[in-house]
Every structure is written in structure tokens, then in C-alpha cells.
Amino acid sequence: MRSILIVEDNEVIIKGLTYLLEKENFHVIICKNVNETMNAIGKQEIHLIVLDIALPDGNGFELCEYIKKYTDIPVIFLTAKDEEQDVVKGLDLGAEDYIIKPFRNRELLSRINNVLKRFNKEDNKIVYGSIK
């Protein structure tokens, strides 16, 4: 079973994404801020990160930069930030996709599956303690 880490602080979106992804047989891990995410990465197998930009203790752009520097885990931004400069920044930081809220369920699932097809799960696995 593939694991998706959702980094989101909005409870309504968390519940909706969890329901949608679990229905598609994904294991869902929830982190509500940057600190929780930093602690979760490297402690469990994660195949994909769905990342918001506006977080209570930091921003998703900086978190994406960190994730890309230390792991090979693919990132999809899922955010209300719809300015062209934000989309370009997210993709320039290495995100595999950028989806603007509100989103369509089928489109989100299709984009998630397309990203996962491009990544071999063994390549995305990081071992506890491997991040310096």
C-alpha cells in the first residue's frame, strides 16, 4: 500500500482528502505544520507528499525546498495560492505538480497517480536517520 503524507492545517480539507485517498487504498499520514512534517520524514515510508503553502509555523515553499534537498519524495502542492508567480516558484523548487484549491476529486486522483507512476517506490524510500 502506498503512503501519502498530507501537509495541511484545514480540518475540512484533511477529512475530505483522507476519505478520498483511503477509498483509493492509499495509506494517509497527516501533518498539520512544518515541524510535524520534519519529524515524520525519515521515520516512515512515504511515497508522495501533498503540501499546502500556508502553514501555521512556516511556509510550504521552504518545506518543499528542504524535502527536495534531502529526499527523492515527490511533492504536489495543493493550495489556494493561484498567482502565476506562486505556481512557477513551486515548480521551480522541484514540485512535480501544483493544484489550486478548490480542486476536483477525480483530477486530484489522476494527478497523484500520474506522479506515482513516474516514481519507483523503492527510490523514494528513506531510512530513519538518513536525513542530516
Enumerate the language-model features and the residues they cover.
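N-terminal/domain-start alpha-helical segments
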Residues: 1-119
